[in-house]
């Protein structure tokens, strides 16, 4: 399917001559060394003592209107099993089902193909009325919501905040995000939540783009923890988009995976089983925090403890099934701005010292790369759609190379330090020398000059021409595929023409051969 989709892109590019269609990308994952994790335990314990009776509302945005319906219903069943009834913890789910993939009647009491609200409790799910915030939904309605519409997400958050007021809000978004759950869709890494029952103007399942969420949600919908139960969302671009203080929707912390996520997703029964009144411990070793695994009281649980829960239980679950290729990271998004500043400073210096060829040697091309990466290096389609590389590994290899100046190495070292601060916990593939708490966040680094072609046409088109979604502008306005408007690409741009100010401008200066007033292939004049 990926090959067919990319071929369609190529054909559209030919029809529109100098302009082209393409698709966006995103990323996420990381963990600390044992010493750092133990220090974190002390920090989060002291934090939790400040509020001994907090309320926590967890919002589960469940887009099951696609071929993940069976898997997502299983996730809800896991939640019902693991959830411990508590006046301090509410678990609210917006569930959109499909008429095509599952006829299950047990998980939610009946089979349906519309959109419903539920309060998840121990071994049961109670259907809810949407009230003023979501009047289309009642306990008897047949309303079909478009989960790819940001206004639906906005309504859901507003409903939860109005009717289940809390001191801490967690938003879990579950569906396709790029990879494992349907690796063949080239849009998966730039967006999330595909709704098969609601098509966009191109006749494809509608979805939520990163920039689109920022355009529609506001600071009012912000959350304490944002978790993507989806693939390829652990990127620097995604993390920066939703950093606190951006003036709109944000999250203080983030749970996400840089590579693809296996089909079962998060292990919700184990996660919720460890959120219980009174806390305590079990007899399992905790490789994330050290010692034995702790249970956390919802009345005092912190963002860091929640993040550690997701990371540790995903590690346990995937490793128990022999899947050592899986990753998950927990990020402190308050540190995302300093990471971006460090990467942008490095980008400016790479431009000033004309180090394109040296970076390309590190990155590699075709079927070989020595950099830690989160895509299939043997697939040219994936080189086009999501060439995501581990940021820390890139900076570390720059720092160790003899082909860069001492200034460049110092800037790379500074970026490594900032990444270490942002990546609180992470785990990854030990065979790739994954460093917990350092590796696990990706960045877009394409082979922009390479030309792509298929048996559909002999015309060869540079990868960068097909990657115009990676942009600061409104790409739809210029006839390109959605969505652009990435804060990572916009912030830090140098106002002077032909002068690099950030990572995006560095890539555009390397790969866009036409930088006149038209902005070249992606309509952006760096």
Swiss-Prot record:
Enzyme Commission number(s): 3.4.22.8
The keyword Nucleotide-binding is annotated on this UniProt entry: no
Superkingdom classification of source: Bacteria
Catalytic-site annotation from UniProt: 231
Keyword set, alphabetical order: Hydrolase, Protease, Signal, Thiol protease, Zymogen
InterPro entries xrefs: Pept_C11_CLOspp, Peptidase_C11
Assembly with partners or alone: Heterodimer of a light chain and a heavy chain held together by strong non-covalent forces rather than by intramolecular disulfide bridges.
Family per record: Belongs to the peptidase C11 family.
Function as written in the Swiss-Prot or TrEMBL entry: Cysteine endopeptidase with strict specificity.
Protein's name in the database: Clostripain
Organism: Hathewaya histolytica
């Amino acid at each position: 399917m990926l090959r067919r989709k990319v071929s369609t892109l190529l054909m559209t590019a030919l029809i529109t001559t100098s302009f082209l269609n393409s698709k966006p990308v995103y990323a996420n994952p990381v963990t600390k060394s044992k010493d750092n994790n133990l220090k974190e335990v002390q920090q989060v314990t002291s934090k939790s003592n400040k509020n001994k009776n907090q309320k926590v509302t967890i919002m589960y945005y469940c887009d099951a209107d696609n071929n993940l319906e069976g898997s997502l219903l299983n996730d809800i069943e896991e939640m019902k099993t693991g959830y411990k009834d508590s006046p301090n913890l509410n678990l609210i789910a917006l569930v959109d089902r499909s008429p095509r993939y599952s006829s299950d009647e047990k998980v939610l009491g009946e089979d349906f193909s519309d959109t419903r609200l539920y309060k998840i409790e121990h071994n049961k799910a109670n259907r809810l009325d949407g009230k003023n915030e979501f009047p289309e939904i009642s306990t008897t309605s047949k309303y079909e919501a478009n989960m790819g519409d940001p206004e639906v997400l906005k309504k859901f958050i507003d409903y939860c905040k109005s009717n289940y007021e809390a001191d801490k809000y967690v938003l879990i978004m579950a569906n396709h995000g790029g990879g494992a759950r349907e690796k063949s869709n080239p849009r998966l890494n730039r967006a999330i939540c595909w709704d098969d029952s609601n098509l966009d103007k191109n006749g494809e399942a509608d979805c939520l783009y990163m920039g689109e969420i920022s355009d529609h949600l506001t600071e009012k919908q912000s959350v304490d923890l944002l978790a993507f139960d989806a693939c390829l969302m652990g990127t620097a671009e995604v993390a920066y988009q939703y950093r606190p203080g951006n003036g709109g929707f944000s999250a203080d912390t983030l749970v996400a995976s840089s590579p693809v996520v296996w089909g079962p997703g998060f292990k919700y029964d184990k996660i919720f089983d460890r959120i219980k009144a009174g806390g305590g411990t079990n007899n399992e070793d905790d490789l994330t925090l050290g010692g034995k695994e702790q249970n956390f009281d919802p009345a005092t649980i912190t963002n860091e403890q929640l993040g550690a829960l997701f990371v540790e239980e995903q590690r346990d679950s995937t490793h128990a099934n022999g899947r050592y290729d899986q990753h998950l990271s927990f990020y402190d998004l308050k540190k995302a701005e300093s990471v971006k500043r460090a990467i942008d400073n490095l980008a400016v210096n790479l431009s000033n010292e004309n180090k394109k060829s040296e970076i390309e040697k590190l990155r590699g091309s075709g079927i070989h790369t020595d950099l830690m990466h989160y895509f299939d290096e043997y697939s040219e389609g994936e080189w086009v759609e999501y060439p995501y590389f581990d940021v820390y590994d890139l900076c570390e290899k720059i720092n160790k190379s003899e082909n860069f100046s001492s200034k460049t190495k110092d800037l790379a070292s500074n970026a490594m330090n900032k990444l270490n601060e942002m990546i609180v916990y992470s785990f990854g593939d030990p065979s790739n020398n994954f460093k917990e708490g350092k590796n696990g966040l990706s960045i877009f680094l394409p082979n922009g000059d390479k030309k792509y072609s298929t048996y559909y046409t002999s015309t060869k088109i540079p990868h960068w021409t097909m990657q115009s979604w990676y942009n600061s502008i409104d790409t739809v306005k210029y006839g390109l595929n959605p969505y652009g408007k990435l804060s990572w690409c916009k912030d830090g741009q140098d106002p002077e023409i032909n002068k690099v100010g950030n990572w995006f401008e560095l890539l555009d200066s390397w790969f866009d051969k036409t930088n006149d007033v038209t902005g070249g292939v992606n309509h952006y004049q760096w």
